[in-house]
Amino acid sequence: MERFVVTAPPARNRSKTALYVTPLDRVTEFGGELHEDGGKLFCTSCNVVLNHVRKSAISDHLKSKTHTKRKAEFEEQNVRKKQRPLTASLQCNSPAQTEKASVIQDFVKMCLEANIPLEKADHPAVRAFLSRHVKNGGSIPKSDQLRRAYLPDGYENENQLLSSQDC
């Protein structure tokens, strides 16, 4: 009799797994949150291996509190570790840098008005006096740099001042 018993066909065991999905497919799907290494899917900020077959496992991980916490820490670390570009570092004008520039310009202007050659700034006695008695006086460069960098500025400033007085 067993031969004549009709049994129902086996139910299809359809799971919710994608059969032909690779970790690289999930990386392109979820963007910069994930990365693939050695055929495994990793969360970039948590550095945890994720199941690349189940999309729900990935989305649940990305919504979890631990992921959001670690992501914030990861981004904070990246901000601290990033190097500043050289141009940004050079353009940074702190109050000390602006004061230094104004002291040097005033020194060049004083030398020009008193007919003191800029080479006199290289004399050891002048250097000692400036460093002892003038605030930021030790930061005044040698005469060749004064001539190259600061003399043209003083010349332009004086020309503008004279042209504004002539009007």
Swiss-Prot record:
The lineage of its organism: Eukaryota, Metazoa, Chordata, Craniata, Vertebrata. Binding is severely inhibited by complete or partial cytosine-specific DNA methylation of the binding motif. Residues 65-86 are annotated as: Disordered. A motif (Nuclear localization signal) lies at residues 80-84. Keywords: DNA-binding, Nucleus, Phosphoprotein, Transcription, Transcription regulation. PANTHER family: U1-TYPE DOMAIN-CONTAINING PROTEIN. The keyword Phosphoprotein applies. GO terms for biological process: epigenetic regulation of gene expression; negative regulation of transcription by RNA polymerase II. The modification Phosphoserine is found at residues 56, 164. This is CGG triplet repeat-binding protein 1. It comes from the Eukaryota. One of its GO terms (molecular function) is double-stranded DNA binding. GO terms for cellular component: cytosol; nucleoplasm; nucleus. Its main location: nucleus. Binds to nonmethylated 5'-d(CGG)(n)-3' trinucleotide repeats in the FMR1 promoter. May play a role in regulating FMR1 promoter. It is found in: Nucleus. The keyword Phosphoprotein applies.
